[in-house]
Amino acid sequence: MSVFHGLAQPLYRCNSIVTVSNVSHIERKKQEEKFMTKLYYQFPNTWFGDCMPFGKGDQFYLFHQRDTRKPCPFGEPFGWDLAVTSDFVHYEDKGTALPRGTDEEQDQFIFAGSVFEAEGKYHIFYTGFNRDYPKLGKASQVLMHAESDDLLNWTKTQDKLTFTPQEGYDPDDWRDPFVIWNEEKQEYLLVLGTRKAGPKEQQTGRTVKFTSKDLKNWKFEGDFWAPGLFTMHEMPDLFQIGDWWYHIISEYSDGNKMVYRMSKSLDGPWIAPADDAFDGRAYYAGRTFCLNGQRILFGWVPTKEDCDDRGNFEWAGTFVAHEVYQREDGTLGVRIPDTVWNAFEEGEKAEDMVIDTPYARQEQILFNDTTDLFRFEADVEFSEGTRSFGLRFYENEETGQSYQYLFNIKENRYRFETSPN
């Protein structure tokens, strides 16, 4: 049974009134058969890994890893594949863009990197990972380079340009390069995620930097941001909006979130906003790209072991696009891209409702028999003394189990979870 419930709980014995208005439930438009048929992109029989976005004209290029789960995440080596889109609704597959190396080569796996245009060519700086190298006394992760004239056909130049892990840093955690042009200093800046050598449990995760005038000769400049907060930094990103620079990382912890810092200078200091994350535990490894004034965050939502909500999160899953915007105070927020929101037909409207429950939880059904893919929009007002309110959907008719968004007013937060959990 697929239903939507409105629910409310009082705070102690105070009266609790929740008003729900302007409610609409809208089903997904049908798509052309030549494109993927899911709103959130995932190539058939693969799981979407780290994404290295680029943009040209009105097209976003999603260079990304495809995990085959043979027999498990990271089981079968992968390179980078490519899909393009102009609206994050319709995708066109371009196949393999950067193939993996052999089992004997450094880039047995093509780990994350970045794509950019400079010096009359397109460039990829990527992480070559060989899982067998540590037992041979070699660094498992080395930065490598490839070039292209058309974004589709790439030539590896690893015999000309490599970045080996520097002394004092972990040779097996040295990855995810990201390159920008520093206009102020007239040089290229490359940052990557790493950690200090030593026990993996120590909070020595950091972003380090290299600089170059010509993309060929690089100088190691040490730490870019080393806050001592995380065991590892992954997928670093740098971009500027107005007067502010922003540095994003994906952090290693039980939280596994994307966090950001902001500064008026690439030299810091890097300030932590009150809300420094873009999403929760189940959205990871995002990079951004700005095309025609629209900056998109390209991250993935992980699967869980055995597709069981009670299982552990796994690496890779499904791509979800967030649009990044800047608030008046310089902090960042994310929202659904307009093209995704507008990919739905005008749908069913519901009557406004009021839930008045002074002593106990109360529910009211908003919609019966929704499809498995829809958008929902409503204005919600609540009275002083309301403890929480929420929305439940996809209810199991026999057990009463469902998913829910629960807004806990007392704690000033909301959760997405199963109910009961």
Task: Give residue spans per PLM region.
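Short, well-structured beta-strand segments enriched in hydrophobic/aromatic residues
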Residues: 295-297
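Secreted extracellular polysaccharide-interacting domains
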Residues: 238, 355-373, 400
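Short hydrophobic alpha-helical segments enriched in small aliphatic residues
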Residues: 3-6, 23-26
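Beta-rich carbohydrate-recognition and catalytic domains
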Residues: 16, 21, 30-176, 181-233, ...
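A carbohydrate-recognition surface predominantly in extracellular/luminal proteins
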Residues: 111, 363-387
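Intrinsic-disorder-associated, low-complexity terminal segments enriched in Asp/Asn/His/Tyr and depleted
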Residues: 12-15, 25
